[in-house]
């Protein structure tokens, strides 16, 4: 279905825009409109009319701002914006690694213990007769699945590892952020049986809606655990200490707004409210004035950037946190805040009347609900002095439903009821992670923030409702909560039940303005109930997508002949790949992508004095050409090397020629023949595919080669390597190394296949670079030098042919449709984020002096961004 860049007559009539506005818009369009825009939808092209910005400043300003000046006051324009706007919600998930996964033998023992194994008697006999004997199925080959709504992705399998490192990234679309949940499952791949579940993690998307990047360790729960993750909504007001004057303290203020999934079977619903602002009036309709045994309590602690626990408070009643909130002074820069929720539950009595077990609430499984008990005797906090004492408060209220003999009789443990046992193991909660550094064996595990002191102190048995606060000098202060009475569990027959624990990073809290956050409460992991941890990087993005006509001035400015705005953005942005992706899709949709790529590559060639390093960096030009090849060249790639990749996957022949990696019994000469055979087939397939290469790609390569010959007329190698650096180093070779990422195969290759693909790609890369293998680096590859030398001329001939554009070239095809307004919304967001950096670049004296045209173009950009800001605010309200 064809798209239109302007509001048609039916749309105008539908929203009843005033006649004078229509007339003025038509007058403006008649002055500056020319047939310009080719909008592509698959292989179909239609020509539309779009306003072209004139060189006359008055006409440009009128064309850019007429929509705002004439239509903003109109209610019809507001309704048009609000009704036609959409939201583009995406989630980027990077799965780094897992640690401390359960061995297969331990999982099998647990299945036997729970009676879930089909061969229970046989497994029991094996465990008794030879407990240390590991069978073939006892190895753990973990992989991770990522599921969101109907989308499901998976990582490659890492064989025989309990601490696998995947480092794979996935892009997921979200249709309903309010209810969507990200579900990650760590699986154990089995060759002769169904894959086994190791652990699971559920992350509600609403906890990521602040759109801030998170890199954390998350605890895995048992595979059968519920998807209903306990959550609390907290309103923060945060002022950090002054960096210039440390004597000026800051403050942290928080209040609970709402609780979700805190209990699965409560006789009385949890009190909840929705406060408009910190310290404002609150409604008491949903607030219970009587405490019950199901009402949760909150422990919280604050960790400084020095690693000290500067605040540690326990036993704050839910209603106090809900109505009054907590305010504390800060004398240190803080790193994170930990919240722990728990509640009282009746103890379970054995048949003889003694307390002998702990009963799950109303038959629910504690692990399934993400809960467990707080250990009653934790180790002392390392930040508290040995002579620290705890002040006590006088009780002022009692529980609403004390235990009666009848209720005790109802809670007597039966053989069918599940029991819980407390543990002194430290709670494992999400922890922050600095950037990891690569080593020869992969990136080293990150140094996580150790919250053991905070966790131990908040997990301790709370007596008489005392609250401990530790200042920066580690002196213990006592604060009393006079409005709350916390009952004595030993006296009243109650004990503490752990609901969950979560962490808020100080960097995720807005400074000096109220902001609310949803916090997931993750389960306690004990020695008997530990499934491992997984490290993730999460980034949720939500873009308000306005109607296409709202972005028309921005599109016109981006497509100006001089490309000043794009050049300026490319200099300052750190997200070149994302910017390049949006630019390529916008210009491809409007039929001007080749002009964009030629301008960017010409500029980079002109600014590079050394031909040996041309296109070696990740600039806006290289990223744009790279993404353009993937945008329209995937069918060509699949047709050229796809069948060979499938044969290599199914082949059991080894190509390993590195003596240090040979398996026992392998013949290096035989492996070398296998490798040479695959390399010859792959090279032949690529060199003979030149006529199948899409015409737009060949036009880009022709432009690059012509410019290189003009810039370096005496260089005989760069004219070939400049092109092969794209078609081989950024297209064919990466696809050979990772076929799944290029949709060539549904799964990642195995270990032996991966090694074969690596050696094939190495040989092709040297052939494309016109370089032989050396004696000092990877000297085991020297046997491939004869093949490289023999095919250098064939490679040159292929590059020369590829850089010509005959009339019968195939056009290329898009794998997915391009939605122009969505791509422009992303570009608008990039420009907003880089607005200040772009202004500083314009004023910088270190760079080349800016021309008047560049200054005028930047001024127009600021006006357009301000106009779009108003539209986005209007659409969001």
UniProtKB/Swiss-Prot annotation:
Identify the Pfam families for this entry: C2, RasGAP
**Which UniProt keyword terms apply here?**
Coiled coil, GTPase activation
Task: Choose one Gene Ontology CC annotation of this protein and give it.
Answer: centrosome
Disulfide bonding pattern of the chain: none
Family matches, as SMART domains: C2 (SM00239), RasGAP (SM00323)
PANTHER family per record: RAS GTPASE-ACTIVATING PROTEIN RASKOL, RAS GTPASE-ACTIVATING PROTEINS
Name of the featured protein: Probable Ras GTPase-activating-like protein ngap
Q: Which organism is it from?
A: Dictyostelium discoideum
């Amino acid at each position: 279905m064809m798209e239109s860049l302007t509001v048609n007559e039916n749309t105008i009539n539908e929203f009843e825009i005033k006649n004078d506005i229509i007339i003025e818009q038509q007058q403006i369009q008649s002055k500056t409109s020319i047939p310009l825009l080719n909008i592509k939808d698959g292989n179909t092209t239609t020509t539309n009319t779009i306003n072209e910005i004139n060189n006359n400043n008055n006409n440009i300003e009128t064309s850019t701002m007429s929509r705002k000046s004439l239509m903003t006051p109109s209610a019809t324009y507001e309704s048009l914006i609000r009704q036609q706007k959409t939201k583009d919600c995406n989630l980027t998930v990077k799965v780094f690694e897992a640690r401390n996964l359960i061995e297969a033998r331990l999982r099998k023992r647990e299945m036997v213990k729970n009676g879930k194994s089909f061969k229970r008697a046989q497994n029991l006999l094996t465990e008794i007769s030879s407990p240390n004997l590991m069978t073939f199925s006892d190895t753990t080959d973990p992989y991770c699945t990522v599921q969101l709504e109907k989308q499901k992705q998976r990582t490659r399998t890492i064989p025989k590892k309990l601490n696998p490192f995947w480092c794979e990234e996935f892009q997921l679309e979200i249709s309903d952020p309010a209810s969507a949940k990200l579900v990650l499952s760590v699986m154990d791949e089995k060759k002769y049986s169904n894959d086994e579940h190791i652990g699971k993690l559920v992350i509600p998307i609403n906890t990521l809606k602040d759109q801030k990047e998170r890199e954390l360790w998350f605890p895995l729960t048992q595979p059968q655990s519920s998807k209903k993750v306990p959550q609390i909504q907290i309103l923060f007001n945060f002022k950090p200490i002054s960096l210039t004057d440390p004597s000026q303290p800051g403050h942290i203020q928080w209040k609970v707004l709402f609780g979700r999934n805190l209990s699965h079977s409560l006789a009385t619903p949890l009190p909840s409210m929705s406060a408009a602002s910190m310290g404002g009036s609150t409604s008491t309709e949903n607030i219970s004035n009587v405490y019950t045994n199901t009402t949760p309590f909150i422990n919280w602690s604050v960790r400084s950037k020095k690693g000290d626990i500067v605040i540690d408070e326990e036993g704050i009643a839910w209603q106090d946190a809900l109505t009054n909130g907590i305010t504390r002074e800060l004398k240190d820069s803080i790193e994170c805040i930990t919240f722990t929720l728990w509640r009282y539950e009746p103890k379970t009595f054995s048949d003889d009347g003694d307390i002998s077990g702990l009963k799950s609430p109303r038959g629910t499984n504690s692990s399934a609900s993400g809960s467990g008990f707080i250990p009653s005797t934790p180790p002392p906090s390392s930040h508290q002095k040995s002579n620290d004492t705890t002040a006590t408060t006088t009780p002022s209220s009692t529980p609403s439903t004390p235990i009666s003999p009848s209720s005790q009789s109802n809670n007597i443990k039966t053989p069918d009821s599940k029991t819980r046992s407390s543990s002194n193991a430290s709670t494992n909660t999400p922890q922050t992670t600095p950037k990891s550094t690569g080593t020869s064996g992969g990136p080293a595990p990150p140094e996580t923030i150790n919250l053991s002191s905070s966790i131990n102190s908040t997990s301790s048995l709370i007596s008489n409702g005392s609250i401990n606060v530790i200042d920066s000098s580690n002196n213990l202060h006592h604060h009393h909560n006079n409005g709350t009475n916390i009952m004595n569990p030993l006296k009243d027959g109650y004990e503490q039940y752990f609901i969950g624990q979560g962490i808020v990073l100080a960097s995720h809290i807005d400074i000096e303005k109220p902001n609310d956050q949803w916090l997931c409460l993750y389960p306690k992991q004990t020695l008997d109930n530990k499934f491992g941890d997984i490290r993730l990087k999460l980034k949720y993005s939500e873009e308000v997508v306005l109607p296409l006509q709202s972005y028309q001035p921005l599109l016109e400015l981006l497509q100006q002949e001089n490309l000043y705005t794009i050049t300026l953005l490319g200099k300052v942005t750190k997200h070149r790949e994302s910017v390049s992706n949006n630019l390529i899709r916008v210009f491809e949709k409007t039929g001007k992508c080749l002009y964009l790529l030629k301008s960017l590559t010409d500029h980079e060639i002109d600014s590079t004095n050394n031909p040996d390093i041309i296109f070696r960096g990740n600039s806006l030009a290289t990223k744009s050409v790279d993404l353009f090849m993937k945008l329209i060249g995937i069918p060509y790639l699949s047709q050229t090397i796809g069948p060979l990749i499938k044969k290599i996957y199914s082949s059991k022949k080894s190509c390993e020629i590195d003596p240090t990696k040979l398996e026992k019994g392998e013949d290096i000469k035989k492996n070398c023949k296998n490798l040479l055979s695959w390399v010859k087939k792959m090279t032949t397939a690529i060199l003979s595919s030149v006529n199948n290469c899409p015409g737009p790609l060949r036009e880009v390569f022709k432009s690059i080669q012509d410019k290189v010959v003009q810039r370096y007329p005496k260089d005989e190698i760069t004219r070939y390597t400049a092109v092969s650096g794209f078609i081989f180093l950024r297209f064919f070779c990466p696809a050979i190394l990772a076929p799944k990422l290029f949709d060539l195969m549904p799964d990642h290759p195995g270990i032996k296949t991966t090694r074969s693909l690596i050696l094939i790609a190495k040989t092709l890369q040297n052939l494309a670079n016109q370089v032989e293998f050396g004696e000092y680096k990877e000297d085991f590859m020297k046997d491939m030098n004869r093949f490289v030398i023999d095919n250098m001329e064939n490679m040159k001939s292929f590059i020369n042919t590829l850089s010509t554009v005959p009339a019968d070239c195939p056009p290329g095809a898009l794998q997915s449709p391009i939605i122009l307004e969505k791509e422009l919304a992303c570009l608008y967001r990039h420009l907003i984020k880089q607005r200040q950096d772009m202004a500083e670049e314009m004023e910088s004296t270190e760079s080349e002096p800016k021309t008047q045209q560049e200054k005028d173009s930047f001024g127009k950009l600021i006006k357009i961004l301000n106009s779009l800001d108003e539209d986005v605010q209007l659409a969001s309200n």
